[in-house]
Each structure stands twice: as structure tokens, then as C-alpha cells.
Amino acid sequence: MPFACLAEASHCCTVALPGGEKAVLRRFFQRPKRSMAALLTRQRMDCKGDGRFLYASRPFQILRFEIRPEVLFAAQWSDQSQGLEIAFEDCWIHGLGAMQNAIRFECTALLVPKEECVEAQARAMVLLSSDSPLTALPTGLRQRLAAQALQLVFVRLERRCQGGLKRALLDWIAEDAMGRADLNRES
């Protein structure tokens, strides 16, 4: 069954990390499991090995639907893009009844360590099956609902970057600084 794009959007944010050296931040992101544990709720994440993870998102409301996304994604360090690449491999959107197989969600993200910050970029799409009963709804309404869903996703991503990821990175920076201070005392 062919799918058509209802909405596509991207979002960028910068996580300020005073004292964060690029090399130190890079070491953090070179271990995808550590990075994903900082970004996502650990109790909802299942590590599948080889940089693949299954994540059951917290439910959210759109209209009368309680939507519960579940995502299988891969995360890996890329020397070419100098960052952690995250790509959805599969996504299940529970809570839409018979319509849940008619909707697809795709997302890619890149977390790039810089001097004293991390730049996060995400691109996402909502797609609808051409034989879905939802095609009977006006196009404008379908597109607005899909755009609203993407904005909710980006709000969550921003909050996770500025919250858990930032805390984990600041702890990582502090641990690295203490380790270097201990080495200097021993010299």
C-alpha cells in the first residue's frame, strides 16, 4: 500500500555546555547506549544490541485519541557527520484502532558535539496510506493534525535535549575534569 506525506518538518536546538570540550563530548556520544539512556526514559527503553533500541513512548492526546508510539531505532556514531546519528527503523502508533496501520512516522536525528555545546537536529514525517479511511477527511484537516503531531514530537525532543541529555553531559564533563585533576595531582 503506497503512503503519501501529510506533514514534514525539522527542528534544531543547541544545548549549552559551559566547559565542555569537543573531544570530551565526542567520547560521550561514541557510546550510543549511554547517549540514549540520557535522552530517553530508561524504563521505557530496551537495548536490542548493535546500537538498536526499542522505545515505548509515554502516551499523548490528539483529539479523542490517546496515542502511544513505540519505536525501533538505530543509533550510531558517524565519523563522516561527526555526530551520533539516530534513525527510526520501524514505528507503531498504538491507540488509533483500525487506523493505526494506515499511519507511518519517520524520523532521523543528528547530535553533533561542538566546543561548549551540542547541536541537535531532527527531521520527521507523518505519512498516510492512500487506502486509509482518513483520506475521506479534508486534506487541510489531515495536514493540520499531522503537523500538530510533529510539533508535539519536537517539543518532547527539545525538552529531552535540554533536560536529561544536558544533565548527563554536564555530569560527564565534571567527571572528566575530576579525572584530569586526579592525574595532575599524581604527577
List where the protein language model places each region:
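Hydrophobic ligand-binding cavity/cleft-lining segments
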Residues: 1-62
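Solvent-exposed residues in well-ordered beta-strands and their adjoining turns
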Residues: 14-18, 58-60, 76-78, 112-114, ...
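Generic short beta-strand segments
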Residues: 50-60, 87-93, 125-127
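Hydrophobic-ligand binding "helix-grip"
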Residues: 66-117
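Beta-strand/loop substructures that line and gate deep hydrophobic ligand-binding cavities in soluble
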Residues: 97-147
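A conserved amphipathic terminal alpha-helix motif
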Residues: 138-183
